[in-house]
Each structure stands twice: as structure tokens, then as C-alpha cells.
Amino acid sequence: MRHRKSGRQLNRNSSHRQAMFRNMAGSLVKSELIKTTLPKAKELRRVIEPLITLAKQDSVANRRLAFARTGDKEVVGKLFNELGPRYEERPGGYIRILKCGFRTGDNAPMAYVELVDRPEVEEVVETEDAAAE
């Protein structure tokens, strides 16, 4: 029976799962938008939300906890220097999961995972004058 067993197994052993979510959390913090399968996205929420909540209070102890969970100094730096202050007033719900169709090949449901309130990247539109020069 699986009573009181939380979390998804995702057909992986525990060390593989832990490494996968550590890498996914790092990728999400660095790029602020990733594409993955829907079950992985839903499970990633359980990893990244407590990390951002931890980053709201900058202390050596919290930085060490975040490093223990991510294993990357660059990720910890961005968490505490950018994301913590950005979400200071938000009481949770730091990521958004958007369904984006199905993967070619195995038809797995795919989703975008993005940080809420992330800065919009403006696309550069070339005009005819700029293209001529």
C-alpha cells in the first residue's frame, strides 16, 4: 500500500530523482523558463518553492541550506541576490506551469515552467532601414 507516501517516483530511483530535480531547479533559476514534462513540472514545484522562500531571508545559514539543495554557487547567488528581493512581498506561488501540448515520439504531456513576475525580454525587430545598413 502506498499510504502517506508523497511525491512521484517518475520511474527513477531516489538518487536519480534527487539529481534530476537539483539540475532542473538550477536550470529554472538560471534561465527563469524551462520546458519539461507535466509530471516533472508539478514535482519541481515542491523543490523550487521552498528554495525561493528560503532566499527571502538572506543569511549564511540559509545560503548553506540552499547550496546543500542545489550544489551550485551561481544558482545560490542568483536566488539570494535577485529572486529573494523580487518575491519579498509575495507569500508563495512563485512559479507558473503552462501546458504546451504533447511531445513528438511518445506523446508525453509537456509544460513550460516559468517564474512569475520575471522580466520580459524585448524582441529586437529589424526595420528596413536597419537591414539596409
From Swiss-Prot:
Organism this protein belongs to: Pseudoalteromonas atlantica (strain T6c / ATCC BAA-1087)
Keyword Cell inner membrane: no
PROSITE patterns from the UniProt entry: RIBOSOMAL_L17
Protein family per UniProt: Belongs to the bacterial ribosomal protein bL17 family.
Annotated S-S bridges: none
NCBIfam families: L17 (TIGR00059)
InterPro entries hit by this protein: Ribosomal_bL17 (IPR000456), Ribosomal_bL17_CS (IPR047859), Ribosomal_bL17_sf (IPR036373)
A biological-process GO annotation: translation
Any GO molecular function: structural constituent of ribosome
Pfam families per record: Ribosomal_L17
CC terms in the record's Gene Ontology section: cytosolic large ribosomal subunit
Domain of life: Bacteria
Gene behind this protein: rplQ
Keyword Ribonucleoprotein: yes
Quaternary structure annotation from Swiss-Prot or TrEMBL: Part of the 50S ribosomal subunit. Contacts protein L32.
Keyword terms: Ribonucleoprotein, Ribosomal protein
Descriptive protein name: Large ribosomal subunit protein bL17
